[in-house]
Structures are given as C-alpha cells and as structure tokens.
Amino acid sequence: FLDLDGQEVRELAGTINVNERALSTLHNRLRRLGRFHFVTERESDESVEEILRYLDRGIHVVLEFGRYQNELAAYILVANLLTRRIHSRYVTRSDEAMGDAARKPRPLVITIEEAHRFLSSSIASQTIFGNIAREDRKHNVTLLVVDQRPSGIDDEVMSQLGTKLSCLLDNERDVDAVMAGVSGARELRSVLSKLESKQQA
C-alpha cells in the first residue's frame, strides 16, 4: 500500500469503494511514519515485549527519542503503542489476580515529561493516557505528569490526577489548571503566589 503512487491509490479507492480523498490522506500519513528508522516492514513486537519484561522484573525503563525529540508523531506513535500494551497487560493481570493479592501486578509509575506534548486537548483523545489516569490506579498503574505549563494539559486528564505537586507558577492559566477541582483552592492559590523559586506546595 505504501509503495503505491497517487494514481494507484485513486484506482484502489475505486476498486474497494472508499472515499478517494480519505484513502489518499491515509496513504500520505502512513508514508510520513515510514521515514522513522524504527518503523520497519517486518512485524515484530520484540522491543515492546523486552520493555514489558524489564517492567515485570522491576527494572526502570526510560525512553529517549534522540534525533526524533522534535517529532511529535514519533512520540505519539511510540507512546501509544507501548502504553496500550502496558494498559492491556495490567488490566488482564489484575483481573486474573482478583481475590489473590500475591498475584497482582507489580506497581508501575508511568512518567510523562513535557506532558502538554502528549496530553493537550487536541492529542489526549488520541492516546490512552486519559484512561490510564482515570482507570488504572485499580490495576496498579499510576500516571505521573510533569510539566511547566499545566494549562496545556487537557482538563479531563488534569481532573483525574489525584495528587498535584506544584512549584512556582507565574501564569494565571497555569495556576487555574492546577487549582481545578482542588478543595481549598483559594487558600492554596494564595500559597502558590508566594512561593519562591525551588519551593513547592
């Protein structure tokens, strides 16, 4: 499919009776993913399985994106593939361990730095992070969100974060985002406004 040229994609759309523009858009977007060296034609989940084995043994895994650090599509693709597998595995294991605490999966913390890149309103619905924040505490998975601009994070996801730790915020929208859904917000807002650099509340 990815090797087809524009005319061949249009012909395929007619053959399988789908919207030509929709198929062309899909074709173009998939071809863009093909430029990432980690996307290969052969089907394999070895890397994901190895990461899951590390997590099972309690070994920390840090994903660095190196040359792809400015490629949002690479972040979203990898984060989605990996976290969906983690979510699925932890839900299954929690269900299988129902009533047997010894079989529950090892607690896991998924940390997202620069979270607004993954959790903005336009992107959060395309990822599983909202589900993880909302549902996975009962499956021993916790989402740790780290960001200097919490106002860039989807309101639904922010509302699901149980514990919030904040350093000095100088933007009102960021303060409002941290305060949303917090009891005693007025008093805490006063404390936040008086924080020195490197202090937290």
Language-model-detected regions and their locations in the chain:
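Conserved ATP-driven motor cores of ASCE-family P-loop NTPases powering translocation/secretion/packaging/pilus
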Residues: 130-201
